[in-house]
C-alpha cells in the first residue's frame, strides 16, 4: 500500500522545519496525516475564459476540507490565443503548454502533494495540465471554467448568434459597414468563459469527459450558469475519496494513467472526430499520450477518422450552433451515447466518477436516463446578460433537443456525414501526415488543385490576402511556422478569416506547417510534417507549383517530378548553415523561444520535447 506522498514533509523529527512552514500556511496538529490536495488554478484577468476563476479554487478548497483533506492552491499562467493572435505574441502560445505542464509538476512534486484538482479552461491550459497529470500520475480531477455564452445581435435586420471569429471576419470584409462591425465586436464575446464555439478550449474540455478525467457536463455547461457550481463542489469531495482509495486501499485504478489508457485515447479521438473538434486537439492528445507512455500515434488517428461519422457540427463549422446548443442536446454524454449505440466506443473503461463509462452513460445520456435531475441539468440555458461572474444566472430551456435526425446531435443513421469531422492527409508534401478539419470544409472543395502561392511567414501571407493578390483557385502555402521553424507553431486564424472576408473561403486552400485555431474553417490543412525547418518537402515548394488535395483519398501531393525535387533539395542543402531557413523574415526570437525550438519535435509527435536529440542531456 503506497504511503501518502505528503508524509515526506509532514512526518518525522527531521521534518520539524517543514511542519513549521506548513503551520504558517494554516495547517493544524490534527491536519497532519490528512491527504494534501493541490489545486492548480489558472485565474488571470487577461483571459475571459479565466477571469471568473479567482474564487473557484477556494470553493473547491472548502469542499476538500469538508471531506477531510488539506487544500493548497497555486496558479499557472494562461495565454489568450485570441488576443495573442495575428502578431508575435502567438509565438508564445504553444510553448506555454510545456511551461504550464512543468509548473504543475514543479509545484506538486516540490511540495509532495498527494492528489490534484486542475481548474483549467482555455487553449493551452487544459492540455498543459493534462500532460502534467499524466506525468505525475497521482489522483487527479479536471474541472474547467466552462464555455462562454454565444453573442446575440441584430445585424442587417436579422438576429445572429455570434462568436469571436464573426468579429474577425466582419472587420476584414469591406462589404460590412463600420456600424455593423462595431455591433458585432461588442456582442461577440458577452460573458466570461471559453469562446462559445467548438474551438480548441471547448474541444479539449469535452475530451476530458471522454478520457474519464472530468465530471459529466464539464465540456458544455455554461460558465455563467449556476449548475456549473455543482461540478466544483463535487470535484472537491471526489478528489479526497480518490486519494483515500489509492493511498489507503491500494486502488491504482483511480490513477490518471489507469484511466487514460490507449482505449480511452481512442474514445477521446472518436469523440473529437464525431463532433468536428479543433485540429489542435490532435497535437494535444498526441502530447498527452506521450506523457502517459501510451503508444497513441498519428496512424491511430488516421484509422479512426476513416470509420467515425460526423454527428455534431458547431461553430465555426455551423455558424448558428454553439456550446449552449450542444448542452441542450445532452452535451458530451449524448454524443458518447450515440457513438456507443453505433458500436464505436469502449464503454467498459473506468472514469473518475463511475466504475465504467457505460455506467455513466446509463445515468447521463439523456436518451437513456429517466433522472429528473439529469434532464433538468441539460436544460441549462444562457442568461443573455453580459457578465464576468461565474454561476450568475439560472435560466433554463423549456425543452431539451432530443431530435437525433435534424437536431444539433445526430444519431449514426442521420449523421452530417459518414466521414468524420477530422482527417489525416499523407503524401509527398506531408510524409508524416497533416490535419484538416473536414467538418468545416465545403463539399465542393473536398478535391482541390491549384498553383502554390508561397510565403515564408504568416505576416506576408496576410499582407497578400488583404492586398487582393490571392485569387480563386490558389493554394496558399505558409511555411517555416512549425514548432521549430516559427518557433512556436503559430495559429493561422487571421489568414483563413481574411480569405473568408474576401469571398475566397470556398475557392482557395491554405497549407501550413503551422497550425490553426479551433475557429478556423475552410480547406485549411495544418501540421504538415516534417516541417520546413526540419527539411520537410514543404520547404521545396516554389511559386506556381501544382498542389493536389483529395480529402476522400486522404492525399496531399506536390505535383513536381521527383528529379526536380531532388535538384531543389541539393540546392537547399548546399546552403549549409542557412539551409531550411526562411529567406526573408523580420522576427525577434527571444532566448526562451530559442530554447523551446532547440528541444521541440514534429507536430506528428505532438510537438513534445525530445531531450535525447541533445547529447549533453
From Swiss-Prot:
Pathway: Amino-acid biosynthesis; L-isoleucine biosynthesis; L-isoleucine from 2-oxobutanoate: step 3/4; Amino-acid biosynthesis; L-valine biosynthesis; L-valine from pyruvate: step 3/4. InterPro entries: Dihydro-acid_dehy_C, DihydroxyA_deHydtase, DiOHA_6PGluconate_deHydtase_CS, ILV_EDD_C, ILV_EDD_N, IlvD/EDD_N. GO terms for cellular component: cytosol. The modification N6-carboxylysine is found at residue 124. It catalyses: (2R)-2,3-dihydroxy-3-methylbutanoate = 3-methyl-2-oxobutanoate + H2O; (2R,3R)-2,3-dihydroxy-3-methylpentanoate = (S)-3-methyl-2-oxopentanoate + H2O. Mg(2+) binds at residues 81, 123-124, 491. Keywords: 2Fe-2S, Amino-acid biosynthesis, Branched-chain amino acid biosynthesis, Iron, Iron-sulfur, Lyase, Magnesium, Metal-binding. The active site is at 517 (proton acceptor). Its cofactor is [2Fe-2S] cluster; Mg(2+). One of its GO terms (biological process) is L-valine biosynthetic process. The keyword Ribonucleoprotein does not apply. [2Fe-2S] cluster binds at residues 122, 195. GO terms for molecular function: 2 iron, 2 sulfur cluster binding; dihydroxy-acid dehydratase activity; magnesium ion binding. Its EC number is 4.2.1.9. Homodimer. Functions in the biosynthesis of branched-chain amino acids. Catalyzes the dehydration of (2R,3R)-2,3-dihydroxy-3-methylpentanoate (2,3-dihydroxy-3-methylvalerate) into 2-oxo-3-methylpentanoate (2-oxo-3-methylvalerate) and of (2R)-2,3-dihydroxy-3-methylbutanoate (2,3-dihydroxyisovalerate) into 2-oxo-3-methylbutanoate (2-oxoisovalerate), the penultimate precursor to L-isoleucine and L-valine, respectively. Belongs to the IlvD/Edd family. This is Dihydroxy-acid dehydratase.
